[in-house]
Amino acid sequence: MIDTILPIPDLFAATRVLCIQPHYDDNDIAAAGTIARLTAQGCEVIYVTVTNDLMGVVDGFATDDEARIALKRDQFAAASHIGITQQHWLDYPDAGAYDYFAVRRDILMHIRRIKPDFVMTCDPWLTYEGHRDHIQTGLAVSEAVMFAGLTRIASSDPTVDAAYQSHHIAGIAFYFTREPNVIVDITSTWPQKVAALRSYHAQFDDAGLDELVTAFDHKSRQVAQGQAFARGEPLKVLHTSALHCGI
């Protein structure tokens, strides 16, 4: 593999990070430890959730409205443990049919409106990723990051486009990746991550939450092997110019 010639941007130099996830728990499952560190140092971290996440709700008797309430309840509970105070939802159908370019337009709108200096999402190029929501979200975010300054490419809100003045996005961080170039030390924020994960009751029963925490207990230790800390989260962090033509 030929590495990019561009430097790896410093995620922890960011002051505003936009984390865009396919489902309501992906940011926290993958990167709650990292995010808790960011918010602890004063970084503003904002969440956007692409799908309505209704397909994974474990209560088979819940109506869609009841499921939506439960999902939001979980998200706000998890957010309280890691310092998230602002969330937005795009409400595309979970594991369903929706237009990729509509998603990209919505994400582009939020990038232009919020003006983050760093963006985080799932790696759409993860080997063997079988969930299209993850692939489409990661790719749409990558394109939106590249196209944010090209105002001839419309977002979903013309008023946002008209008011937008180009800003600098220092980098993009991909989680759920098998090609990390940064391992973040989450030893100090591991308890916050566990508390966030244990907030997700709508899609996990108690046994499922135990399995989830156990899996990421092992994973956090595995990725920290050879590092000077006990627990880590793997990220692929790229300069935005590395997203096109293999620079």
Can you describe what each PLM-predicted range is?
Residues 1-114:
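Active-site rim/loop-helix segments in enzyme catalytic domains that contact anionic ligands
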